[in-house]
Amino acid sequence: QARAMEAAGATIIDSGGESTRPGAPDVNLDEELERVVPVVEALRAQSDIVISIDTSKAPVMREALAVGGDLINDVRALQEPGCREVVAEYGVPVCLMHMQGQPRTMQANPHYEDLFTDIENFFTQQIAACEAAGISRDKILLDPGFGFGKTLQHNYQLLNELERFHRFNMPLLVGMSRKSMIGNLTGQPVDKRLAGSLAVATVAA
């Protein structure tokens, strides 16, 4: 599937072994390693495409980077033990995502005192922690976490004022493709959300 995506024009492949969709169960370390590391190793042997590792576990980060991973994409923003140290050691880029709660419960009742202030404070704290661990500021990307502990209103408020995060002077990763925020607005099932995905991506850009 990764090779087909590259042939279709993909420039980055995101490889993960644990679903982070709302309500998703946890995956143990051994199983995640078995799901991720062989795939990264095989893909690297056949391609120079950028490989992003979607994980929140330091051992998975370490082993996947050792066999050819290029970037860490962490929905928990390197807050789990040992993660910052691994990223600092390998000197790779990292995407820090904001998520309120955990995947299993994050959509139960999302609430913010002030949406942007809360997320900006989170990013400020995590950027400082990364720099203290030896991660260069120019290696950090930020993801406001559309659909991760956010109501429909929160998601579209973020989209409408996304430029507020420009103050960090860091690249923004915006992941909205086929998400429920599109389906809830358009009434379309997952396989019919391409037009909506393109529309919100255009607004974000």
For the regions a language model picked out, list residue spans one by one.
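Short, conserved beta-strand segments within well-ordered enzyme catalytic domains
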Residues: 14, 50-52
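Active-site-adjacent loop and "lid" segments of alpha/beta metabolic enzymes
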Residues: 1, 20-48, 55-59, 65-66, ...
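Phosphate/pyrophosphate-binding loops at sites that engage ATP/ADP/AMP, CoA/4′-phosphopantetheine
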Residues: 7, 11, 126-139
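Catalytic domains of carbohydrate-active enzymes, especially glycoside hydrolases
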Residues: 1-16
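Conserved Motif II region of HX4D acyltransferases
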Residues: 145
